[in-house]
Amino acid sequence: MRTELNNNATLLLKDGNVAHVNNIIGSGGQGFVYSVTVDGEEYALKWYKQNPGNVFYENLQKNAEDGAPSSSFLWPKAVTKVRYGSFGYIMPLKPEGYYEFSQYRLAKVRFSSFRAILNAAIDLCEAFRLLHAKGLSFQDLNDGGFFIHPDTGHLLICDCDNVFPHGESSGVLGKARYIAPEIVLGKNMPNSYSDRFSMTVILFMLFCIDHPFEGMNVVRYPCMTEEIERRLFGEQLCFMYDDADTRNRPVRGIHSNAITMWNLLPDVLKDSFKQEFAKAKLDAPETRMTEMQWIDVFTGIRDSLVKCPLCGDESFFRRTGVVCINRNCRGTSTAEMWMETESRSIPLFNNNILRMGKSDAVTGRVALKPGGNNILLVQNLTTHDWRVITPSNKSVTVAPRGFFPVKEGMKVEITDNKSTITYTITK
């Protein structure tokens, strides 16, 4: 069977189009990746070294026909007809400005802000929420499976060919160290629950760079064998910050990223990781946090992320106020008013920018009323009218670019094209 394709080769696609091979741009364990041209547009083509079989082929074809669950997936667009004993599929090319996650881990690329990391985490969770809502599971999420823009945090997921319906197997168990313990131990095949474990591992690595289970326990074994790997990542899996088991703590000089970043994380995020990686949760896949629960955590943290009024560095605002994390500044500030829902708290202070959705789009800004008296105003920076209900139950419409003065007890209804969220002004 022929494994590599020649430049200028032509391949027939199942949708009737023709792919013209330009040149090879990468390779991996399963196959080769080529630049191809289809109907004047450039795509990436993954060509399998070994034919994965009819079941895989038919599933890939169905996924291509159904379309991507979200624009965050570099999803199969069309499958080739079988040629040279194998086949492949075309997908969108990675846009300029996006980098593999491994480059962030090696510090070759850095996020421009903590907000960008939060945006990447939300993008990942939202993509998997939509994937699972379609009854599909990814089955092979690992650190080599996506690209991220360092400034916006926008995330793109590749290697989508192992996506199968929940409960059905693609024949691929996943990459070692990212596989859920029940898969390592042979208790289950990959499914949406194991996806959630792999996703949480990636989330931890987004924030702490290091792997959540590679502490002292792994350092003890400079030569990893299959037996040791099964024990450390299956039978005796232990989170490096487990409250009850300290044997796998990060090692100074080796896990410097984890030690530094863990201390900077808000308590709600640290508690979420501890909860998800606790032994009781590891043994009960169906109890793992859903993607929406993670999104609520991250949007809440993003609401509290503010710029220090003195130096401009990012810091987390709490009810007790904020202390700048810049050691050369240590400026302090407080908020007298907040916009709140049951799950979100947004501090209101002069010059704060309000972002109130998963998309991180700017919704409004806070300003001081000219003339003194320290009266705070909120400006509507959306394209929709807001409805403000005063403490005396009077309804006021705030048009785009308009302002309203902040008073305790007010309710603010903010509507976009899909939903309305009601905030209450509190002290």
PLM regions and their residue ranges:
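ATP-binding glycine-rich phosphate-binding loop
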Residues: 2-40
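The N-lobe alphaC helix and its flanking beta3-alphaC-beta4 segment of protein kinase-like domains
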Residues: 48-72
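C-terminal boundary/linker segments immediately following FHA domains
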Residues: 389-427
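Conserved C-lobe activation region of Hanks-type protein kinase-like domains
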Residues: 203-270
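Conserved catalytic-loop aspartate of Hanks-type protein kinases
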Residues: 195
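Catalytic-loop of the protein kinase fold
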Residues: 128, 132-150
